[in-house]
């Protein structure tokens, strides 16, 4: 396995990193995107369709290419956080964080004592990194609470200021709904724009990276706003857009139309 580059060190150096958001189960999709130049992949166990075994295989596929695999867990719960880290995830994104106490619980779940309360038992990752994993995990694993609720937005300074939090990820869909807007990127709407500025400013004050679920159209704006961890596609979106482009091109060249 090629050694994965530390995302935390890249963020600390001011680098912008681009990733692919994986929602479909199985290692093949990860293998397909892992040689394209992405800086990381995210395995989405919250809204994606994979179980734990499939997520483990996806992490392993990323490992083979030396691509950092981050997992969005279904919930901020110590059991599943520990399991995805034991599988080899190099970062954990936790959804629906409400308070600084929630974020502190996430840090505790991701860090071995004396920093946190993670249980030691890296069954799979131990075969990858050997006995030294226990001494490097606290420094290598990225802890990323999501800012996507009104409560988290109100407490963003306290959340990102916590020792052990490495980045905050803006969830534009849930955040928009929390602000009374339709789900999605609502740039140009004052409430949404102000929320983005608030999160970015808080992360800068505390020296933390700021992340976001995005797409190829909006990503350049997010770079300009100061985001450093930006997803530019999901596997489902990439499959749909590429399939549609191929189908449209063939129909245009052959003069055929959609059935029905």
Swiss-Prot record:
Database matches in InterPro entries: Aldolase/citrate-lyase_domain, HpcH-HpaI_aldolase, Pyrv/PenolPyrv_kinase-like_dom, Pyrv_kinase-like_dom_sf
Single Gene Ontology MF annotation: metal ion binding
EC number(s) recorded for this UniProt protein: 4.1.2.-
Active-site positions on this chain: 47 (proton acceptor)
One cellular component (GO) term of this entry: cytoplasm
Cofactor: a divalent metal cation
Domain of life: Bacteria
Record-marked site positions (Transition state stabilizer): 72
Key words of the record: Lyase, Metal-binding, Pyruvate
Function per UniProt: Aldolase which can catalyze in vitro the aldolisation reaction between hydroxypyruvate (HPA) or pyruvate (PA) and D-glyceraldehyde (D-GA). The condensation of pyruvate and D-glyceraldehyde produces 2-dehydro-3-deoxy-L-galactonate. Has weak activity with hydroxypyruvate and D-glyceraldehyde.
Protein name: Hydroxypyruvate/pyruvate aldolase
